[in-house]
């Protein structure tokens, strides 16, 4: 009640104060103020002495800093609670597999990476950060260190089968990898590139028979019409082929980008910069950068072969499309020709049907008394219509015939014989001159 009674006194004084002073007063009253029961006496102090103390810049700065610290602490707590958790599968040099869960913040702090380095990207890429190789292949993300290989968040059944059955043996040296005598990162990179090439090859091997079978059914000359269901299947397979061509192109571009720069090849040899023994071997005779270049060139050629195979399928689809269009045009031409023939027949019948129209006007004539006149007029009508229709069809056939290629004018036999005799005479003269010159030189 005392607070309510003191409001008329406080409001005029509060209206004179600036907005920042009022905010500071509100913060201070809510944080360190006394209970509400003692508001009457405190109200007068707020109007006079407390307002003067709180209006200072130091007091305002302290209140703003406290408010800022509170919001930053809350935001950090919420970010820590919302931080994503990765399911990490670790492979060491001996092929041992361990799985664990780790927060993203903890993981990139342990690996010495930045938060942007562990972002998921659906584009194929190979990058090096802080002596760590980061490989992204759509749903596969891997971090390669000189000691181990980390696979982050695999969510594919086929990938799981490859991870736990084939990859450990390849990393331990029991597989058919060419880079087994080289450091660990070579084996890891080769295993991942080999898996991705096999994946692209599998997609192509699935699409190729489907596309060829559909094209054979569409281009078959036995079928006069085009099956729309086959066209729909071909359209879907064409879209899948376009996606495969894009994946192969991105794979080739990512490898070619590394091959064009020697510094990136040197950075991919991470054991060279962390292990002094490997550095001595690389300095002595084994050039690890050159070995890495040969490895990437090999898989670039494999990707190029896949690209050529996909391009051949695309050319077959385009050629078959042109053949289908030609067949459709031929069927359309047949229908148009039939329409012209029927139109000509209708025209000829209507032309000689005028005779029947003349007799149907109910006019009296002497021809109606003879019973043979009906059959005579009817026969003349049909014969005349048939003759005119035949003439129109022959005219149409002459107009639609393809023009013959121009004939080459043949030379007469006499000129050919004369040319041959002249050639023989010239050859004999040259031989005679040559023999005479040789005799003179011998003498």
Curated annotation (Swiss-Prot):
Gene Ontology MF, one: magnesium ion transmembrane transporter activity
CDD domains the UniProt entry points to: Mrs2_Mfm1p-like (cd12823)
Residues noted as binding Mg(2+) 2 in the record, renumbered to the chain: 329
Activity regulation, free text: May be regulated by calcium ions.
Protein's membrane topology: Multi-pass membrane protein
Pfam hit, one: MRS2-like
Transit peptide: 1-49
Gene Ontology terms describing biological process: lactate metabolic process; mitochondrial magnesium ion transmembrane transport; transmembrane transport
Described purpose of this protein according to its UniProt entry: Magnesium transporter that mediates the influx of magnesium into the mitochondrial matrix and regulates magnesium metabolism. Also permeable to calcium, sodium and potassium ions. Required for normal expression of the mitochondrial respiratory complex I subunits. May play a role in maintaining the inner mitochondrial membrane potential.
UniProt note: domains: The GMN motif acts as an ion selectivity filter.
Complex formation: Homopentamer.
Name used for this protein in its record: Magnesium transporter MRS2 homolog, mitochondrial
């Amino acid at each position: 009640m005392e607070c309510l009674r003191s409001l008329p006194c406080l409001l005029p004084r509060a209206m004179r104060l600036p907005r920042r002073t009022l905010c500071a007063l509100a913060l201070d009253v809510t944080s360190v103020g006394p209970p509400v029961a003692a508001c009457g006496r405190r109200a007068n102090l707020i109007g006079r002495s407390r307002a003067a103390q709180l209006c200072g810049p130091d007091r305002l700065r302290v209140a703003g800093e406290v408010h800022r610290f509170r919001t930053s602490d809350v935001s950090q707590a919420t970010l820590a609670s919302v931080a994503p958790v990765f399911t990490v599968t670790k492979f060491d040099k001996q092929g041992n597999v361990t799985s664990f869960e780790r927060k993203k913040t903890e993981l990139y702090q342990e690996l010495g990476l930045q938060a942007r380095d562990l972002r998921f990207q659906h584009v194929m890429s190979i990058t090096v950060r802080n002596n760590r190789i980061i490989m992204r292949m759509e749903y596969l993300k891997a971090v390669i260190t000189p000691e181990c290989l980390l696979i982050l968040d695999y969510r594919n059944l086929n990938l799981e089968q490859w991870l736990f059955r084939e990859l450990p043996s390849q990393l331990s040296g029991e597989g058919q990898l060419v880079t087994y005598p080289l450091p660990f990162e070579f084996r890891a990179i080769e295993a991942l590139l080999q898996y991705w090439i096999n994946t692209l090859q599998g997609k192509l091997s699935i699409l190729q028979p489907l596309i060829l079978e559909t094209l054979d059914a569409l281009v078959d000359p036995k079928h006069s019409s085009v099956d729309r269901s086959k066209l729909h299947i071909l359209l879907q397979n064409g879209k899948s082929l376009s996606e495969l061509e894009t994946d192969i192109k991105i794979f080739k571009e990512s490898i070619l980008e590394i091959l064009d720069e020697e510094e990136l090849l040197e950075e991919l040899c991470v054991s060279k910069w962390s292990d002094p023994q490997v550095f001595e071997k690389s300095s002595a005779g084994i050039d690890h950068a050159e070995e890495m270049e040969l490895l990437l060139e090999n898989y670039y050629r494999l990707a190029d072969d896949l690209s050529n195979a996909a391009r051949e399928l695309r050319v077959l689809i385009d050629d078959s499309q042109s053949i289908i269009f030609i067949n459709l045009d031929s069927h359309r031409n047949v229908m148009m020709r039939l329409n012209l023939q029927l139109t000509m027949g209708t025209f000829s019948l209507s032309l000689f049907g005028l005779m029947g129209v003349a007799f149907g006007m109910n006019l009296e004539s002497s021809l109606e008394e003879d019973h043979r006149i009906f059959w005579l007029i009817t026969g003349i009508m049909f014969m005349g219509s048939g003759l005119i229709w035949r003439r129109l069809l022959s005219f149409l056939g002459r107009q639609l015939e393809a023009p013959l290629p121009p004939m080459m004018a043949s030379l007469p036999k006499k000129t050919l014989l004369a040319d041959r005799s002249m050639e023989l005479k010239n050859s004999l003269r040259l031989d005679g001159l040559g023999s005479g010159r040789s005799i003179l030189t011998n003498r």
